[in-house]
């Protein structure tokens, strides 16, 4: 969503949007390997109003992931606090002593003995939250280059499928969707 460090990571969605829409302002981020819906502001007012909705946890976010192994339960709530793993940045890790609150609801969409498809609904927005939570459950996201297994997948199987926000001008609910390409 934003430029990374180094010339090879300079190409990103924000840079491309600024070519066509120079006033584009960042509202939130997605991990570099995550696909799907993002929202940008075209005015400072819109950017501030939308960013506040993210900060206040008023945005409903829904992701789809393919994870390793067969998930046997139908749904659940993951409540595992997260903290930066300073020795292995950008990795995050579960830490019950100093970690920040991180909550994720999940729902099984389908599964077989090799993999499962989950709907993930983060209630907080910590860095790598969904990736660490899936790994902590013993079902890392397929193709995850940091928390997953060595994989034959050409990409990380995590997709931001839906965002629901209140329009910054009129306050009406707005829903943005992008079906997962996997």
Describe each PLM feature range.
Residues 1-182:
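RNA pseudouridine synthases
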């Amino acid at each position: 969503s934003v430029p990374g460090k180094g010339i090879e990571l300079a190409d990103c969605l924000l840079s491309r949007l600024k070519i066509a829409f120079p006033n584009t302002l960042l509202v939130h981020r997605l991990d570099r390997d995550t696909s799907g819906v993002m929202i940008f502001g075209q005015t400072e007012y819109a950017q501030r109003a939308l960013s506040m909705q993210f900060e206040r946890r008023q945005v409903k976010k829904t992701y789809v992931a393919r994870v390793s192994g067969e998930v046997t339960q139908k749904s659940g709530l993951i409540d595992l606090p997260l903290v930066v793993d300073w020795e292995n940045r950008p990795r995050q890790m579960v830490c019950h002593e100093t970690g920040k609150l991180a909550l994720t609801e999940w729902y099984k969409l389908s599964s077989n003995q090799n993999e499962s498809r989950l709907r993930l609904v983060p209630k907080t927005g910590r860095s790598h939250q969904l990736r660490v939570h899936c790994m902590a459950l013993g079902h890392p996201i397929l193709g995850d280059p940091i928390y997953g297994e060595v994989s034959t997948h050409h990409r990380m199987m995590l997709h931001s499928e839906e965002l629901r926000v209140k329009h910054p001008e009129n306050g009406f609910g707005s829903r943005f969707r992008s079906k997962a390409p996997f």
